[in-house]
Swiss-Prot record:
It comes from Actinobacillus pleuropneumoniae serotype 5b (strain L20). Belongs to the IPP transferase family. The gene is miaA. The record marks 93, 115 as: Interaction with substrate tRNA. Pfam families: IPPT. This is tRNA dimethylallyltransferase. The keyword Nucleotide-binding applies. NCBIfam families: miaA. Monomer. It catalyses: adenosine(37) in tRNA + dimethylallyl diphosphate = N(6)-dimethylallyladenosine(37) in tRNA + diphosphate. Keywords: ATP-binding, Magnesium, Nucleotide-binding, Transferase, tRNA processing.
Amino acid sequence: MGPTASGKTDLAIALRQTLPVEVISVDSALIYKGMDIGTAKPSKAELELAPHRLIDILDPSESYSAMNFREDALREMAEITASGRIPLLAGGTMLYYKALLEGLSPLPSADPEIRAEIEAKAEQIGWSGLHRELLAIDPIAGKRINPNDSQRINRALEVFYITGKTMTELTAQQGDSLPYNVLQFAIAPQDRAVLHQRIEQRFYKMMELGFQQEVEKLRARSDLHKDLPSIRCVGYRQMWEYLDGDISLDEAIYKGICATRQLAKRQITWLRGWNSEITWLDSLDPTSSKLKMIEKIAQNSIKL
């Protein structure tokens, strides 16, 4: 696990060359086909060295949930262990990790009629008005959800209208835990400034590789729009705004870099607050040092 641009892919590839592991991607952006540059998807050469499961499994027009991920990951893990190898989960979508490790709370399925009612109400009082309503119903979720995040506001209210219980109440009820012995490692630079620099450098590199053209191709599709989960991914959202004429290219790049840094901050905060035992690895340490530490801990825990 680790924040974006921390070196997770490079370490996963090195582990694939060293240990009997198979990589499973834990990334809510890498699941989408045709979204390669802006997601920093592993290259063809990298995937030849270390094939990643759960990459390129959906069209950008489709949605994917933590429940979907848990089901898919458990299936892949069963196949890997049946072949005598070890599942190596690598990525930065912390909600997916949480769902996999702890199971899912009993949240109801989406109800199109209730969602339509919420959206109709949003047209009358705005999403900010609905956010105030959410704060009154579920203060914890309301404080956590951004007033501009219509998707999450809609879902939180929908859950309450369906069940009569708040999202906070329901998510406190855990599902089935993971039936595996799990070793958890987090990778990040100790110096936050280093991570910020990496993020900026990578964003400009993505622009050189044709990120704008990648988004233009997506935007040309009539079935894609800015409110889809795929297009809401950091970088894509800001580039879409530029192509819509809402902001300049320089603003899109700046906002994209800022959004990526904010994502990294949330990922690190989540990891710091995670109540399970995590071994931290410094991104700047030599790969050989990180491999030795992982091998030592693994040898003490599982039979390789």
